From Swiss-Prot:
One cellular component (GO) term of this entry: cytoplasm
Family note: Belongs to the RuvC family.
Protein name per its UniProtKB record: Crossover junction endodeoxyribonuclease RuvC
Cofactor: Mg(2+)
Taxonomic classification: Bacteria, Bacillati, Actinomycetota, Actinomycetes, Micrococcales
Subcellular location(s) of the protein: Cytoplasm
Positions annotated to bind Mg(2+) 2: 68
Enzyme class: hydrolase
Function summary: The RuvA-RuvB-RuvC complex processes Holliday junction (HJ) DNA during genetic recombination and DNA repair. Endonuclease that resolves HJ intermediates. Cleaves cruciform DNA by making single-stranded nicks across the HJ at symmetrical positions within the homologous arms, yielding a 5'-phosphate and a 3'-hydroxyl group; requires a central core of homology in the junction. The consensus cleavage sequence is 5'-(A/T)TT(C/G)-3'. Cleavage occurs on the 3'-side of the TT dinucleotide at the point of strand exchange.
EC nos: 3.1.21.10
CC cofactor note: Binds 2 Mg(2+) ion per subunit.
Organism: Renibacterium salmoninarum (strain ATCC 33209 / DSM 20767 / JCM 11484 / NBRC 15589 / NCIMB 2235)
GO biological process: DNA recombination; DNA repair
Assembly description: Homodimer which binds Holliday junction (HJ) DNA. The HJ becomes 2-fold symmetrical on binding to RuvC with unstacked arms; it has a different conformation from HJ DNA in complex with RuvA. In the full resolvosome a probable DNA-RuvA(4)-RuvB(12)-RuvC(2) complex forms which resolves the HJ.
Length: 193
C-alpha cells in the first residue's frame, strides 16, 4: 500500500510518501517540505500548496492520503492556516478519487512511538528507525508527514484504503478504548466528590 502523509501548514507543509507491505515493513518513497512566504497574500500561499500537492499526487499516485486532523490550538491564526492548507490537500485528493484519512497528533505519536505524548524528537527517531534511514528527515514537518503515513498503514491494515468516515477494525478498538477510559475517569472523579 502506498500512503501519502501530509502535515499541513501555511508556512511549512510536510509531505511524505511510504510504501508499506503486508508484514508492516515500510520504505521511503519521497519526503519534502513545501514552504510559502508569510509575505505573500493568502491566496498565493494556498496556490503554492495546491500546485505542490497536485504535482506530488500525480507523481506518486498514492492509494490513500493521511492528513493530520486539525486539533485545538490556542493560536487562532495558526489553526486557520492549518485548516486552510488541509482543505486544499483534501480537495486535491478528492478530485483524483483518492481516499483521505485524518489522524490526531496523539494517535500518530502512539502508533509510531508507543506513547501518545511523545515529543518530536522521539517521533523523528522512530520514523528514522522504522524506515531504516541513514539520516533523520528534517525539518520536523517532514518527519511528521512520514509518521502520518506509517500510522495510517499500520492502523488500517494491509491493502486497506479506508477513509476518514470508514472505521477500520483498529480504529473501532481505539475508539472503544478511549470511551472506556473516559468513563473510568468520570467514574473516579464522581467517587472523589
Amino acid at each position: 500500500m502506498r500512503v501519502f502523509g501530509v502535515d499541513p501548514g501555511l508556512t511549512r507543509c510536510g509531505f511524505g510518501v511510504v510504501d508499506v507491505a503486508a508484514n508492516r515493513s515500510a520504505s521511503l518513497v519521497a519526503v519534502g517540505v513545501i514552504g510559502s512566504s508569510s509575505e505573500l497574500p493568502l491566496s498565493q500561499r494556498l496556490l503554492v500548496i495546491s500546485e505542490s500537492i497536485d504535482q506530488w499526487l500525480d507523481t506518486h499516485s498514492p492509494d490513500v492520503l493521511a492528513v493530520e486532523r486539525v486539533f485545538s490550538q490556542t493560536n487562532l491564526s495558526t489553526v486557520m492556516g492549518v485548516a486552510q492548507a488541509s482543505g486544499i490537500v483534501i480537495a486535491a485528493a478528492a478530485k483524483r478519487g483518492i481516499a483521505v484519512a485524518l489522524h490526531t497528533p496523539s494517535e500518530v505519536k502512539a502508533a509510531v512511538t508507543g506513547n501518545g505524548r511523545a515529543d518530536k524528537i522521539a517521533v523523528t527517531a522512530m520514523v528514522t528507525r522504522i524506515l531504516k534511514l541513514k539520516v533523520a528527515p528534517t525539518p520536523a514537518d517532514a518527519a511528521d508527514a512520514l509518521a502520518l503515513a506509517i500510522t495510517h498503514a499500520w492502523r488500517s491494515g494491509p491493502g486497506s484504503t479506508a477513509a476518514a468516515g470508514e472505521l477500520t477494525p483498529a480504529r473501532k478498538l481505539w475508539l472503544e478504548a478511549e470511551a472506556k477510559a473516559r468513563k473510568n475517569v468520570e467514574k473516579s472523579s464522581k467517587q472523589r466528590r
